[in-house]
């Protein structure tokens, strides 16, 4: 896995959410085509959610092979702090959950755009741009 820190000069433009990659691994041609046109990364939460969702060993190995080729943003103290701020601001009013807060915080801290089918889960966070593939 290509671990990317905020100090690295090689940056992705987009962070892809779990639901998009789930469709990719399910063989969605439109998603595969879309992902082939953008420079994207994943973060720790997306990686864990995909690993958790792959029940069969073969499926998990396939997913891990693909994920190992992607840019990857690990959790950092800055991301954790931003996620806490987002939870404080949006958890009660908008129902923001921890995984989505960590995804949004990664997007904010690395100045990315979020690619997700779950636009409603993030639309109230004004600091990020959300794109539906």
Language-model regions, residue ranges each:
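Short, well-structured N-terminal submotif of metal-dependent ribonuclease cores
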Residues: 1-42, 51-65
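Short loop/helix-cap segments at secondary-structure boundaries that form the rim of catalytic
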Residues: 31-35, 120-127
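A generic structural signal for short hydrophobic patches within well-formed alpha-helices
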Residues: 21, 47-50, 80, 122
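Conserved glycosyltransferase catalytic-site signature
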Residues: 18, 44, 99-101
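Ligand-binding grooves and catalytic loops that recognize ribose/phosphate and carbohydrate rings
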Residues: 59-68, 78, 83
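Active-site neighborhoods of divalent-metal-dependent phosphate/nucleic-acid chemistry enzymes
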Residues: 2-12, 72-120
